[in-house]
Each structure stands twice: as C-alpha cells, then as structure tokens.
C-alpha cells in the first residue's frame, strides 16, 4: 500500500509539473513576442518560461491559501547558490529592522572608500539581497567600494509606501554612520535597477530636504520605473508583449504595490483612469512630444481620450505622488539632484521613463550620462551570472556602470 501511495504521489506531481510546463510554454508562444533585435532569443524564452512557471505554481499555492504567488517565486529564486569572492568580505546586518548586505574589499585602504547604496529590482514583488548578490560583489571589488544592498519589504504583503520608507530609513542610517563603515561622506552613490531605480530616484529626491546628511554624489538608474500615470507612451505600445516585463505583469505589480483592483486593467490601458485636466498638468513632462522621434519608428499612435472612469481615478490617484512617480517632482527638487547615469533598453516597456527623465534632468542643468542598449530588454542585468542563460548586454551594462563610478 505504501509503495502504491508513493507511486500515485510521484505520478501526480509529475503530471502536475508537466501540465504546468506545457501551459506556460504554450502561453509564452501565444502571448509573448521576442524581437529580432534581441540577441540569443532562446535564452530569453527559457528565462521567461521559467519565471512564469514559478509564478503559475505560486498562483496555485495562493489559491490554496498557503502563500502569495510572488513569495513562492522568490523562495525558488533564492535557492540559487550565492556567488562568493575571496577579495570581498560580505556581512549580513540590520539597519534597525531592515536587513542589508554589506560588501567591503578585504584589502585595507589608507583612505575612506566610496560608498554605494544599492536597491534591487523585481517589480516590488520579487528580487532580494540574494538575487543581486553578484552585481554587488562586482561593484565592491572593481570600484574598491563599500556597498550596502537594502532588503526592503515587498508586495503584496507590504503595500505602498512601505518599500519607499524602508529604503529611505536604510539610506539615512547608512549616511549617519559612514565613519563606522570607512566611507568617504563626499563619495556616496545610489544605484538600482527597475523599481530599485525608483527607490534610488525617490531617495535622492527626498534627501534634497535633508541638509544635515551628506549629499549624494551621483545616482545610477538602470531601466528605472519613474511614473505610474501614463501607460500609452511609445514604449508601452511597442513593447507590451516583450518579456521579461510585459504589460500584464507590470499591471499585476502595480496592483500589488498600490493595492489597486486588477479589474481596472482595460480602463488604465485605454487611458480612461486620468481626467484630462490632470493629464494636462503633467503633460509637459510626460507627453510623447518629449520623446525623440526615432523611438517612435517601431509604431506609436496617440490614444484618444475616452470617458473617464472616476472610480478608477479615485483608486489610482495615489500614483500622482512623487514618491510613486518621481518623474513628476517639481523643478525645485529635480534641479538639485546629483550627476546621473541612466541606462535604458530598447525592448523595455519602461524605456520612455528613462528618456523623459533624461530630458528633465538636462533641461534643469543636471549632468547626465546616458547609455542605450539597442539589444536590451527589461531585467537583463539580473541574468548577469546565469551562465548559459546570460546575455552580452548585461556584461556591457555592468562595465558601463563600473566605468561611471570610477570617476568619483
């Protein structure tokens, strides 16, 4: 009987796993598009299917009341062994209640080192101190820097503004303790990818009001999310079905973070969540006329205004806060920001965020170094150490970031 029960259990698990895999692969080929401009398209297909497979399993566990889907996906992602470097000392610490990883070169330094505050990406729902460990190791070793990676709390368990608050608290703690970690207060950089770029941007903007703290020397924004207001720009239309960040996944993350009902998807997609007078207030910064024409060549049509759904607007209007959408911060704040390095990717749903923020910064006299990855897609840097599933684009981004940081 025991053997029979085990056989049935193993068989059920095998059928479940195979069925899930076939569903994910079929859905990928039916709904997602890999442009010719992306090198190694099959690597991206495999990564996309693996991610959606973990989320599919997670959704099943969520329906059973066992955990949230992103929690299960994060659990599986964190099973990947951590890379280590004999030249870098890594410590797991807490800044108050916030977990952080501290990376410091083993070789002693006669002078205070440059400091990097790193915020990982993951759409506010996944990503961790472990998933971005290799990036932080390289930054510490190759820039001879002290790196603090912030383990902020994530959605859907923790809604806005918890992530923002955690990042600001951790940054403030570090800036108040630079001498403890051997960091030069005149050389502190913030850095982040995706929503980590959001955190780096928001933190830098909020620190403008803190003259009592050391001033941030530079910020590095890697395909950042910078506004949650307009979802009809050229990159949203061109890259809507391109992994690793499709429109469906982006809106799911949006709803998890801001506690918005996912039933508003079609309303938001068609721009019916925003009253015309509100759009006019921010159009000077978000309008497609601010985007160079060459980025509209793959297709763009202006979305005509439809009837506004006031219920959707009332639920979503919290995104008009600059801590959600730092692209709409006032000139008096943006003009005081430090030198900025921005990395954008052609096949990224959020590409235009980088283009619009670059223009805002430059218009206000803030020095900007911009790198555009013609073969890049959202999330490519997170696959930096994935071996056969990594991309040359990720290595180029890493090299450019290191080159920028070494200036300071």
UniProtKB/Swiss-Prot annotation:
UniProt-listed Enzyme Commission number(s): 3.1.1.-
Topology in the lipid bilayer: Multi-pass membrane protein
Principal subcellular localization: membrane
Swiss-Prot/TrEMBL keywords: Glycoprotein, Hydrolase, Membrane, Transmembrane, Transmembrane helix
Protein name listed in UniProt: Arylacetamide deacetylase-like 3
Pfam families assigned: Abhydrolase_3
Upper lineage: Eukaryota, Metazoa, Chordata, Craniata, Vertebrata
Catalytic center residues: 194, 348, 378
Motif (Involved in the stabilization of the negatively charged intermediate by the formation of the oxyanion hole): 120-122
Family label: Belongs to the 'GDXG' lipolytic enzyme family.
Domain of life of the source: Eukaryota
MF terms in GO: carboxylic ester hydrolase activity
Cellular-component GO terms for this entry: membrane
Glycosylated residues in this chain: 321
Location relative to the cell: Membrane
Bilayer-spanning residue ranges: 2-22, 46-66, 109-129
UniProt keyword Cytoplasm, yes or no: no
Gene name per UniProt: Aadacl3
